[in-house]
Amino acid sequence: MKKPNPIIKYFLTLAILASGFASAYSQDLHFSQFFEAPLLRNPALAGIFTGDYRIQGVYRDQWNSFTNAYRTGSFNGEYKLPVGRTDDYLTIGLQILYDKAGSAGLTSTQVFPALNYSKSLSNRRSSYLSLGFMGGYVEKRIDISKVTTNSQFDGAAFNPSLGNGETFPSPDIHYWDASVGMSYNGTFGTVQQNSLFFGLAYHHLNRPMNSFYQNTAVELQPKWVVSGGARFNVDERSEFTVQADYSYQGTAREVIGGVMYGYKLGEFTDDPKYVLGIGAFMRIGDAFIPVIKLDMLPLSMAISYDVNISTLSTVSQGQGGFELSISYKGFLDRENSAKNKMLCPRF
């Protein structure tokens, strides 16, 4: 197979990196294991898990076929508190997101506290309606010395000694951002382990300025996210989990969804300590995503890889993004633990 001309490949790479730089202004970061970053989907998904507390981390390494890969890390923690003598509960959380992208070293750091109130809708404590809020501080920064433009093309070749022709008032921007969401979760059927949820979130409700040129007309567009999922037993040892998100922000649309098959290991299948999972997800028009997951309660780990199926697959050599997620959740030794307080959803 004929190798692409190195000059053509260079400019294609430069164009893709530039488009990634532009997309950082207008679109949000995303994970293929979106189900392992619940607060980024919807603040009203905080606390929807089996336990009193949960700590999660996701790391994404994208487009390693290029010199400067895109690297993203997410960390979130959640802690559930009972509300008086009722079956309601309040979840307090924290979402931290860090991203570094492209040759210009564009970095983004976000720190968002979150609150989610879950109202019990059943005296069996098997269904809840939640209202969540998340808001905090964002910093974005670029390395001006690494910004390249077509002004550095001297007619024959790229010349880094030429000025890039750009003047930035500041190499960083800071702003406050906020999200709000609602969700419903509950059990269904005759098996307690069968559960489902639906959610709707509205991100960037304050439309913060998002310009290194201090242009107040350049706003971060609001984003709507519709989420849904279900987990159900097939037999004593087998279960399926279905998850999907539809989001739109400005002119951008994204649909991602898929299914995981879980096989329960060990003696106690009603409350298994070990579950081996394998599944596949699809980001429509962009990537096919195989996933392997292992639950070793209270610890869970998952690995996924994006197989690029978009028009960029030729330049990226079919390489997409590798992701690793780790989750730790458990109950506290207390009288009002969620273990005794509610029938927890299984997500």
Predicted regions span which residues?
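Bacterial N-terminal signal peptides that target proteins for export
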Residues: 2-12
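Bacterial N-terminal signal peptides
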Residues: 11-20
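Sec/Tat signal peptide C-region and signal peptidase I cleavage site
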Residues: 21-26
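Subset of outer-membrane beta-barrel
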Residues: 27-347
